[in-house]
Amino acid sequence: MTEKVAVLLGGTSAEREVSLLSGQAVLAGLKEAGINAHAVDTRDVSVTTLKEEGFTKIFIALHGRGGEDGTLQGVLEFLGLPYTGSGVMASALTMDKLRTKQVWQAVGLPVSPYVALDRRQYSEMAANALLATFTHLGLPLIVKPSREGSSVGMSKVNTLSELPAALEEAFRHDDDILVEKWLSGPEYTVAILGDEVLPSIRIQPAGTFYDYEAKYLSDDTQYFCPSGLSDEKEQELAGLAMAAYRAVGCSGWGRVDFMLDSDGAFYLLEVNTSPGMTSHSLVPMAAHQRGLTFSQLVVKILELAG
């Protein structure tokens, strides 16, 4: 049977616009390699029709809910269609930053100090009790929804007076949020392709932190690959990335994000099971450092589909 690939893009999540860019880039890369690939916007087309439309393999270029959270993966499993990236369990787990942190803590991997808060707790706690909950974390803080990507709903809190607005913003996007200690060092990201760890990238945003604008819109964000780490630190980071990736059951490809704190220690932030593939994206940058063109990268990811 001739292979016919659906590149799933767009969707309905808060990361729709990024996904459209990722998907079109992936589509162009696959076509450059001579693969019979077609764009499918899951906002407009039901994925349950993919098999009857003759598609034999699925490249997931969706980000966020409905594409990266295990629900789509479950449908594709039911249809018997091979797809790129992690399976149902790992996709669902890593979409939830809190549960991911809990797994990493259980196996002894380093995560930044945090407090988890749900909407019910927030509504029932008095203001002074709420503030007391976070005092041991110190200032500044970073507040984020547990189940959003691309830094959607995330805020930095420099003074306690800024905390209520940051909590409200995070709760606009999720019923569970995380309040974390602010880590002062640079951010690093490590891409994984099959069983191979790609070179790390150091991220230097022009603004306060690596938010949505810095990730996708700003030309002022700087990326360093090679990252400038010593060989010893690079090996340490690669080992941590693979351990974190495997602990939550990921497969195929993905990207693990870290912060290096002022104490010289790496702390895990999250795993992306369907990383961005735009002109600003990091996995293509790391793959290029390893000698892979964009087209070769997307073909390799497709070959890893299961």
From Swiss-Prot:
Binds 2 magnesium or manganese ions per subunit. One of its GO terms (molecular function) is D-alanine-D-alanine ligase activity. Its cofactor is Mg(2+); Mn(2+). Cell wall formation. Mg(2+) 2 binds at E270, N272. Residues 101-303 form the ATP-grasp domain. One of its GO terms (cellular component) is cytosol. ATP binds at residues 134-189. It is found in: Cytoplasm. Pathway: Cell wall biogenesis; peptidoglycan biosynthesis. It catalyses: 2 D-alanine + ATP = D-alanyl-D-alanine + ADP + phosphate + H(+). PANTHER family: D-ALANINE--D-ALANINE LIGASE, D-ALANINE--D-ALANINE LIGASE B. Mg(2+) 1 binds at D257, E270. Its main location: cytoplasm. Keywords: ATP-binding, Cell shape, Cell wall biogenesis/degradation, Cytoplasm, Ligase, Magnesium, Manganese, Metal-binding, Nucleotide-binding, Peptidoglycan synthesis. Belongs to the D-alanine--D-alanine ligase family. One of its GO terms (biological process) is cell wall organization. This is D-alanine--D-alanine ligase. It comes from Pectobacterium carotovorum subsp. carotovorum (strain PC1). Its EC number is 6.3.2.4. It comes from the Bacteria.
